[in-house]
Amino acid sequence: MNPLSIAQDELKAIQSSQPIVWLNRNYQNPASAPATPNVDALYAAEARLKRFAPLLQRLFPELEPSHGLIESSLIQADRLNNRINPVGGLLFLKADHDLPVAGSVKARGGIHEVLCFAESLALTHGVLKDVDSDYCTLASQSARDLFSKHTITVGSTGNLGLSIGVIGSALGFKTVVHMSSDAKEWKMERLRKRGVRVVEHDADYGAALEAGRLETIADPCGYFVDDERSPNLFMGYAVAAKRLQAQLEALNIKVDADHPLFVYLPAGVGGAPGGITYGLKHIFNDHVHCFFAEPVQSPCMLLGMAGAPGAAPTSIYELDLKNRTDADGLAVGAASQWVCDATRNLLSGVYTATDEQLYQQLYLLKDLENIEVEPSAAIGCLGPAMLTSEAGQKYLDSHRLSHRMENSVHIPWLTGGSFVPDEEYQRYLAKAVNVST
């Protein structure tokens, strides 16, 4: 096992599946992030999504109100704030659980990745003359004929596969999704109805990912969406920070030294929270404080961020953890090394939570704000209370934030839920009521 920047008592807590708050010793240390991407790629992704907006509006009528941009609301949640935030300030919910087209944060990175591939093919084969062309041309039969010769493959616990499958099939690509044993049946069925080939694995996310990778290697017209090391996915997520900046400005919400912003991001393999963190830190610098949130059984990003730069992340299985959690989107055994090496200096810390705690937050979201999410999305709501822990107080004190908390802003990132079938959600809610009352 690689040397980890984790204290002995923290390690014992992790091994015994106890919730902890881990502060990143490499925060603000650029040397700890040898793979930091060029920020130009963020602006290129933002521009690409704008170029594709007319096409996306044509393919997905639900995007008409946003003129083809896939974006979610920022919801002020005062009732929830009164219940879950003991440190003061305002609470907003980033409603990616309700993102159109794919119903989760994965719509950001997954759709951008497929659009990158489609754009490259179209430019290479003359379907698009240049990036100033009419991108609605990509809905033509000639474009679909081109795309149908290629197969897009991805490994997933559920939501990334859903986003890749939806956009890939809409453009005319053959699409294959390798699903881990954690994946929900309704997600697989939704993909099959769109003509996507779903391969089920009786193993974890890592095995599904590797199977997809191997299948693509054998296909000369194959394209693999690599959730572990894809800059295109990463930058699709990073664009969310630009959109959030505009939403905060529209609400006259300041983010500066006297008005710190705290963002709480559910983390699986790391691409989505890593990309969002990268974008937020580029825009708000030291005035934003990003924390990842993971199940106690699957703290892969904690172990990855605590590892040495350039080293393969430690697997949760090396600590005898079982990766068993109802937060299926976060059930990952080992973090993305590339994401860790791209963002290690940007992350404030990681906290972990039990499934029972997730269900308690799921209940509060429904009871107080009438918001329905899947269990993995609820973990961000534990963020404000996390700051009252010994480690949380240490963080606030060391960054001279304690006296500024009355002016702080807190944003749990709700990552998925709107596509969950009602009977599945009712099962979640029944469990949530049971542990909350």
Curated annotation (Swiss-Prot):
Record's keyword terms, sorted: Lyase, Pyridoxal phosphate
Enzyme kind, highest EC tier: lyase
Any single GO BP term: isoleucine biosynthetic process
InterPro entries on file: D_Ser_am_lyase, Ser/Thr_Dehydratase, TrpB-like_PALP, TrpB-like_PALP_sf
EC number: 4.3.1.18
Name of a matching Pfam family: PALP
N6-(pyridoxal phosphate)lysine: modified positions: K106
Cofactor: pyridoxal 5'-phosphate
Family: Belongs to the serine/threonine dehydratase family. DsdA subfamily.
Name of the protein in its database record: Probable D-serine dehydratase
Organism of derivation: Hahella chejuensis (strain KCTC 2396)
Organism classification: Bacteria, Pseudomonadati, Pseudomonadota, Gammaproteobacteria, Oceanospirillales
